């Protein structure tokens, strides 16, 4: 965040030049940076896959093309919730495929305070970040268990 690797195209270029570079996949900033539209095109999906192939850490926050952090239970954000869950599933599966059995994947529920979070006219958050973090954690634990029950999943 707030760095040279905040720009998706620049980051992809850096990865071409330094393929050994490991990242923390903060995908929400790429969604806003490139103003991704849903449904996502194949090109954008391939860009995110490249980021995930080079990531040893994943940040858990859901964005849409206008906002880097959206409420996960609002109906208008459900398409993005599913997109991010699919990306997390892919990122975790890719990480598991290249990591040793005793390795640790870091998944950080990175939910920021106001003004990162969406607020009302009084500056109060519209959601409960702690509860959202617990929900995201539960989703990721389920994804992990699903992948664990299907070893060797083809990506």
Labelled PLM ranges:
Residues 26:
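Active-site glycine-centered loops adjacent to acidic/histidine catalytic or metal-binding residues
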Residues 17-21, 31-155:
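Histidine-acidic metal/acid-base catalytic patches
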Residues 1-22, 131:
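Active-site acidic/histidine proton-transfer and metal-coordination neighborhood
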């Amino acid at each position: 965040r707030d760095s040279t690797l905040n720009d998706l195209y620049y980051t992809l270029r850096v990865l071409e030049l330094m393929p050994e570079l490991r990242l923390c996949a903060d995908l929400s900033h790429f969604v806003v940076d490139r103003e991704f539209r849903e449904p996502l095109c194949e090109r954008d999906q391939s860009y995110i896959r490249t980021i995930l192939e080079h990531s040893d850490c994943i940040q858990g926050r859901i964005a849409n093309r206008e906002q880097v952090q959206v409420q996960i239970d609002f109906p208008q954000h459900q398409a993005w919730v599913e997109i991010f869950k699919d990306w997390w599933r892919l990122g975790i599966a890719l990480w598991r495929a290249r990591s040793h059995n005793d390795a640790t994947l870091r998944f950080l529920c990175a939910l920021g305070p106001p003004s990162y979070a969406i607020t009302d006219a009084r500056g109060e958050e519209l959601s409960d970040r702690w509860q959202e973090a617990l929900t995201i954690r539960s989703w990721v634990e389920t994804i992990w268990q699903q992948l664990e029950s299907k070893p060797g999943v083809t990506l």
